[in-house]
Curated annotation (Swiss-Prot):
Catalyses which reaction(s): RNA(n) + a ribonucleoside 5'-triphosphate = RNA(n+1) + diphosphate
Organism: Sulfurovum sp. (strain NBC37-1)
Encoding gene (name): rpoZ
NCBIfam families: PRK00392.6-2, rpoZ
InterPro entries per record: DNA-dir_RNA_pol_omega (IPR003716), Pol_omega/Rpo6/RPB6 (IPR006110), RPB6/omega-like_sf (IPR036161)
This protein's name: DNA-directed RNA polymerase subunit omega
One GO MF term attached to the UniProt entry: DNA binding
Subunit organization: The RNAP catalytic core consists of 2 alpha, 1 beta, 1 beta' and 1 omega subunit. When a sigma factor is associated with the core the holoenzyme is formed, which can initiate transcription.
Amino acid sequence: MRTEQLTAKAMEKVNFDKYLLANAVGKRAEKIANGAEVLLDYDTSGMKYTDIALREIAEGKITVSLEG
């Protein structure tokens, strides 16, 4: 899937809030970098942490919500 399509799909999951998406991708990428389990069902060895996080959100593997 192209990056633009993936981003559009992920944006739907966060009600088109680009700031929320950017924050969620950053936090999830940091967790992955620190050893969190990747939730995708295919090999991600050549992918950047941010790409993995974006795919997890787009595929609905993790839920993003506002806290507070």
